[in-house]
Every structure is written in C-alpha cells, then in structure tokens.
C-alpha cells in the first residue's frame, strides 16, 4: 500500500496545485471537500495509508457566521496537519486562537508577492530560505492572497513566519506536528514552496516516495475495465494532448471497444483535420470516424457573442454529434473525454462548494442533463504535465505528447465575439505563422526552440478594425493578438519574454501573408489576474 496525503478543499481555485506538489515528490494524494464524512477521513488515515492532512485555502472568512470548518477528527487522528491560508485561519480558530479581518485591523487585503521572515527553529522551515538579511534572518519570497489574519496563536503554537503587515504568517505546534502558513507554498510564485511541501510530506509525515506513473496506468486500466465491462466507448478526438492520451489509455484498457470520433467543426488549426487522421492511423491504430460538421457549428454560432454561450453551444453540438454517431455503434454506452484537473477547478461552480466560478469548460460545463451516454473521464485527476508524462509512458510520440494545449471549443474561444468562417480563416493562417516561427527560432542559451520554451502559444482574433497604411493606400482591417505563456501547471502562468526579433518577424509575415489583418499586438498578462485563453 502506498503512503498517501489527504487534502481537504475549502474552495480555493489552486487546491489542485497542492496535490500536484505532493505528487511531484512521488507521493499519492487525494482531494476531498472539507465537509466530507468524518468516517471517510478516519478510514483514509487508519486503513488506506494516509500519513498526513493538508487544509487548503478558500474564499470564505472564518470571522463570518457559518463559515467552513475542518472536521474535528482532523486534529484527533495523531497525524501531521498543514494549514494553508484559510486552512491556517480555521486551524487557529478551532484550536483556540483568534482571527480578525483586514478591515477590523485597519489594514488592506494582501494580494501578491511578499517577503516573509522565516523563523528557522521549526522542523518544517529549518534551512529553507531564499536569502538572509544583514542581521542573519532567513527570508522567503512568497505569494499572499488573504483578507483575514491570525491575531492570537493557539496556546500550544509558536511563531514560524512573519511579515511587517502580517505578524503571524506561520505557526507551528511541533509536539503534534501541526503547521500552518498564511502564504501559498503550492503556487510557483513562492520560490521555496515545493521544498516546503516536500519537507512536510517526506520528513514530517514520513511518506515514502514510491508513487509512479506506471502505478497510475495499472490502476486506471483496471478501473476503466471495471467501469466499462463489455460495453463500447465513443471518444471525441481533437488531436490535442488530452484527448490523445485519453484515447491511448482507454485503448490499452479495452482495445477495439473504443471508437474515436473526430469532429471537424471548422475551428481547428490550419490543416489540422488531415494531420489528426494521419497521426492516429499511423501511431495508435484505433478506429477513427471523421465527421465534417463545419456548417452545423457555424450555423449554431451565428449571432452569438457571449463566450459562455459559445462554449455551451459548442459543447452541446459535440454531445449531439456523439449521440448520433453512438447510435451507429453497437453497444456504445460511454462518452469518453480528456477532462483534466484545470478544467475541473476552473469550472468550480459546477459542484465545488465555496469556490468562485471563473469559466466553464466544454468538457464539464456545457453538457445537457438528458445526455444518453455515461461519462468516462480517466484523466480528470491529472495536471497537464502529468498527462504528458502518462502519454510518454503509454508510448505516444513526443511530437504528439508535447504539442501545445488546444481548447475543446477550438478557435471558437480565440475569436472574440461572434464566430464567422471569414474570421476563422484569418486566424488559422496568422496562428500557423506564429507557431512556425516559434518552432524555427532557436534560443542561443538553451539551444531549444521557442516553441519548446513556451508552454502555450497562439493567436487571438479581435473583432475590431484599425487604420493602417500599406504602400500608398489606407487600410482599415482587423487586429490579431499573440499570446505565449510559460507555466509548470497551467493554474498560474507568466507571459513569455519572446525575442523582439522573433516578434518582429511574425508581425511582418502576418501583415504580408494574411490579407485582412493590418495590426498585431502581444499580450503580456499573467495568470492571475488574466486567464490563459481570452475567453
């Protein structure tokens, strides 16, 4: 039995990052809502290999009546507990400390980078720091996101970290191995965050690092076979990483019981339809049905500008096509999708208590209630980098596994406002030029292409026209935005600092080769506050 960590979710949009950091250390983790049955927690710890518990952040305030609390059993099972942000506040409140809102303290809410003084006398932080001051104090560069603060430590706790604006930024009860931080060690903005979480998991909880992707494959294959039995599965294939890996995993489990349906909705990347068919016929050997649905999708999207409405229309059309195709396949009872963790967390409003909805994804937010197929989502607990690792372990070619992510709604959410065939054609050509130049431009330091150095890159069509000059004439044409980001987990991201020469070449090619576009801009927004996709 593998050692495990239980994560109780209080509604944070980055709870899954905690699980990712734990898994980075080759320890299995599970996420459950904070108000799950206490018996589940007891069994997880006492019967299923659980070695520790982490309490996530969340949007609530412990100072408000009826706010979430951790089940009391968490503090009675004799295992280490780590509280993060809201998790720290509820731990302090439940164990006898005090918490106050920023307003009551006459302070502003704290959001963004901060420097925390680490008190290194605790087992958790000893020796972990980014730099030290002239007085010898260890300093951590961290990410804060809170309004409330702990003002009084519980009687058995001591101070573990502090800032000027947050005097109690960390606390510890070493005897019971209870620890808590006001900052977020799970996000990449906290430089030593991974080291802190791995210290907690490996040294405090004493978990053995023995969970590997091979174990996940074996478990997933067994689960798929149990779920599906002798029934057949239909999978919507886009050619992207997620659906490709899902197809490979399901095919390994049930072979020819899987039929992939590739829906060409006219919103794919340039020439992608032909490439998808060739790739899967050559590499996977699975049954693939190609459906030309361009006119259907364009007709349904005509006049629709709202991004949520577009996503739901696209999701609905996908499902209806799958249902029509499944009627032609004997014993087809399941619809498989490449839903992954970030899809689920960003669609938090659909079943996640306390979380704030950001956007819905076509995989999880646009499905009709009367869907006639059961849902199979074998990747829904994996992050993007884990999906890639799984793809390699399944034997998929690198060019398939490391292709940049592409949204299920395709260019439908990269064309802002109403979707038209004319706009899709312009965007396809501009995007192809951008990706081609990223692949062809090598960074002198790393000797890698800028395509490999970016996690996701694409063009966005803006439904506005700008004045330009070409030759001796005035132009009044459309604008395209370029977006390129670097990220480890797609939950947070930094904009990519592409060479100006590369951006200049992309601009020149788009302006000269794509008639109808006369202006190109580059998006330098990070996530947060922006999302990676524009819609």
Curated annotation (Swiss-Prot):
<dbReference type="InterPro" id="IPR022310">
    <property type="entry name" value="NAD/GMP_synthase"/>
</dbReference>
<dbReference type="InterPro" id="IPR014729">
    <property type="entry name" value="Rossmann-like_a/b/a_fold"/>
</dbReference>
<dbReference type="Pfam" id="PF00117">
    <property type="entry name" value="GATase"/>
</dbReference>
<feature type="domain" description="Glutamine amidotransferase type-1">
    <location>
        <begin position="4"/>
        <end position="210"/>
    </location>
</feature>
<comment type="pathway">
    <text>Purine metabolism; GMP biosynthesis; GMP from XMP (L-Gln route): step 1/1.</text>
</comment>
<feature type="domain" description="GMPS ATP-PPase">
    <location>
        <begin position="211"/>
        <end position="403"/>
    </location>
</feature>
<comment type="function">
    <text>Catalyzes the synthesis of GMP from XMP.</text>
</comment>
<dbReference type="Pfam" id="PF00958">
    <property type="entry name" value="GMP_synt_C"/>
</dbReference>
<feature type="active site">
    <location>
        <position position="186"/>
    </location>
</feature>
<keyword id="KW-0315">Glutamine amidotransferase</keyword>
<keyword id="KW-0436">Ligase</keyword>
<dbReference type="GO" id="GO:0003921">
    <property type="term" value="F:GMP synthase activity"/>
</dbReference>
<feature type="active site" description="Nucleophile">
    <location>
        <position position="85"/>
    </location>
</feature>
<dbReference type="GO" id="GO:0005524">
    <property type="term" value="F:ATP binding"/>
</dbReference>
<feature type="binding site">
    <location>
        <begin position="238"/>
        <end position="244"/>
    </location>
    <ligand>
        <name>ATP</name>
    </ligand>
</feature>
<dbReference type="Pfam" id="PF02540">
    <property type="entry name" value="NAD_synthase"/>
</dbReference>
<dbReference type="InterPro" id="IPR004739">
    <property type="entry name" value="GMP_synth_GATase"/>
</dbReference>
<keyword id="KW-0332">GMP biosynthesis</keyword>
<dbReference type="InterPro" id="IPR022955">
    <property type="entry name" value="GMP_synthase"/>
</dbReference>
<protein>
    <recommendedName>
        <fullName>GMP synthase [glutamine-hydrolyzing]</fullName>
        <ecNumber>6.3.5.2</ecNumber>
    </recommendedName>
</protein>
<dbReference type="InterPro" id="IPR001674">
    <property type="entry name" value="GMP_synth_C"/>
</dbReference>
<keyword id="KW-0547">Nucleotide-binding</keyword>
<feature type="active site">
    <location>
        <position position="184"/>
    </location>
</feature>
<dbReference type="GO" id="GO:0005829">
    <property type="term" value="C:cytosol"/>
</dbReference>
<comment type="subunit">
    <text>Homodimer.</text>
</comment>
<keyword id="KW-0067">ATP-binding</keyword>
<dbReference type="InterPro" id="IPR017926">
    <property type="entry name" value="GATASE"/>
</dbReference>
<keyword id="KW-0658">Purine biosynthesis</keyword>
<dbReference type="InterPro" id="IPR025777">
    <property type="entry name" value="GMPS_ATP_PPase_dom"/>
</dbReference>
<dbReference type="InterPro" id="IPR029062">
    <property type="entry name" value="Class_I_gatase-like"/>
</dbReference>
């Amino acid at each position: 039995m593998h050692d495990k960590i239980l994560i109780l979710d209080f509604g944070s949009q980055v709870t899954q990052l905690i699980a990712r950091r734990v898994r980075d250390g080759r320890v299995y983790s599970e996420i459950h809502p904070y108000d799950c049955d206490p018996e589940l927690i007891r069994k997880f710890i006492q019967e299923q290999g659980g070695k520790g518990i982490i309490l996530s952040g969340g949007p609530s305030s412990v100072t408000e009546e009826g706010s979430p609390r951790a089940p009391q059993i968490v503090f009675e099972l004799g295992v280490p507990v780590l509280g993060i942000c809201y998790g720290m506040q509820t731990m302090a409140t439940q164990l006898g400390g005090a918490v106050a809102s920023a307003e009551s303290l006459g302070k502003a809410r704290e959001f963004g980078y901060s420097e925390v003084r680490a008190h290194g006398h605790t087992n958790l932080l000893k020796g972990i720091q980014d730099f030290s001051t002239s007085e010898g104090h260890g300093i951590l560069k961290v990410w804060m996101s809170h309004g409330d603060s702990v003002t009084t430590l519980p009687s058995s706790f001591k101070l573990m970290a502090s800032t000027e604006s947050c005097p109690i930024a960390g606390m510890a009860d070493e005897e019971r191995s209870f620890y808590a931080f006001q900052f977020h060690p799970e996000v990449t903005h906290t430089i030593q965050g991974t080291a802190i979480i791995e210290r907690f998991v490996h040294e405090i909880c004493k978990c053995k690092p023995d969970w590997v992707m091979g174990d996940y494959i074996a478990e997933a294959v067994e689960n798929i076979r149990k779920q599906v039995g002798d029934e057949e599965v239909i999978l919507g294939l886009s050619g992207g990483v997620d659906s490709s890996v899902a197809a490979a995993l399901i095919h390994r489990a049930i072979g020819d019981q899987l039929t992939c349906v590739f829906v060409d909705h006219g919103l794919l990347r340039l020439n992608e339809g032909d490439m998808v068919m060739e790739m899967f016929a050559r590499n996977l050997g699975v049954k693939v049905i190609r459906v030309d649905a361009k006119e259907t999708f364009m007709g349904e999207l005509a006049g629709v500008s709202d991004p949520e409405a577009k996503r739901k229309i696209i999701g609905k059309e996908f499902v209806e096509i799958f249902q029509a195709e499944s009627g032609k396949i004997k014993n087809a009872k399941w619809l498989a999708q490449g839903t992954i963790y970030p899809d689920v967390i960003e669609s938090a409003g659909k079943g996640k208590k306390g979380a704030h909805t950001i956007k819905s994804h076509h995989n999880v937010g646009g499905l009709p209630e009367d869907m006639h197929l059961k849902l199979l989502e074998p990747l829904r607990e994996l992050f993007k980098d884990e999906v890639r690792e799984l793809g390699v372990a399944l034997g998929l070619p690198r060019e398939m596994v490391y292709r940049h992510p592409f949204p299920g709604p395709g260019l439908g959410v990269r064309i802002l406002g109403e979707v038209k065939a004319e706009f899709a054609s312009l965007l396809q050509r501009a995007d192809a030029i951008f990706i081609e130049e990223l692949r062809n431009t090598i960074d002198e330091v790393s000797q890698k292409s800028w395509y490999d150095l970016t996690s996701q890159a694409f063009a966005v069509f803006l439904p506005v026209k700008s004045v330009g000059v070409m030759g001796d004439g005035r132009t009044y044409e459309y604008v395209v935005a370029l977006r390129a980001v670097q990220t480890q987990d797609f939950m947070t991201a930094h904009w990519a600092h592409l060479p100006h020469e590369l951006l200049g070449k992309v601009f020149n090619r788009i302006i000269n080769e794509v008639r109808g576009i006369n202006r190109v801009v580059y998006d330098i927004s990070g996530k947060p506050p922006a999302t990676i996709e524009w819609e």
